[in-house]
UniProtKB/Swiss-Prot annotation:
Transmembrane segments: none annotated. GO terms for cellular component: cytoplasm. This is Elongation factor P. One of its GO terms (molecular function) is translation elongation factor activity. PROSITE patterns: EFP. Keywords: Cytoplasm, Elongation factor, Protein biosynthesis. It comes from Oceanobacillus iheyensis (strain DSM 14371 / CIP 107618 / JCM 11309 / KCTC 3954 / HTE831). One of its GO terms (biological process) is peptide biosynthetic process. InterPro entries: Elong-fact-P_C, NA-bd_OB-fold, Rib_uL2_dom2, Transl_elong_fac_P/YeiP, Transl_elong_KOW-like, Transl_elong_P/YeiP_cen, Transl_elong_P/YeiP_CS, Transl_elongation_fac_P. Pathway: Protein biosynthesis; polypeptide chain elongation. It is found in: Cytoplasm. It comes from the Bacteria. The gene is efp.
Amino acid sequence: MISVNDFKTGLTVEVDNDIWQVIEFQHVKPGKGAAFVRSKLRNLRSGNIQEKTFRAGEKVSKAHIENRKMQYLYASGDAHAFMDTNTYDQIEIQGKQIQEQLKFIKENMEVSIVSYENEILGVDLPNNVELTVTETEPGIKGDTASGGSKPATLETGLIVQVPFFINEGDVLVINTSDGKYVSRA
């Protein structure tokens, strides 16, 4: 058990028989009445975000999340195969479970699989990934000074806005939290 006064961003807790990750929290001490902790939590099973308020000092169970380094192998229909890099065990995860992360995952990429009591909750991605441009309009000479952008399709099917000087075949660094172009690799 852990006190809500000890909340930290990223902490995983068990509340109402579900697994939640603390996104934001704030200790509130009103002039009148008891102190409380206002928090914003993400459900690790469904991905939903919910605001919850706890009385100061209230206890919740800490969820012991396991992170395993795994390598993405291939997709077979809607199932996606991953291999543990230490034991070489393979697991399959359904596409609907990791739909948002699939836009950033390519074959042979190492990711962290998040699980709780042998139940797979999702995939943790690195902050940035390198992806190759498969389709974009050619840059027109003189456009580089205007500072505009154009759409580019990447090898995973993700479409991002990139500067005019980016061409097909370029390798780009993409931020996985917002899906935006960072730089050329």
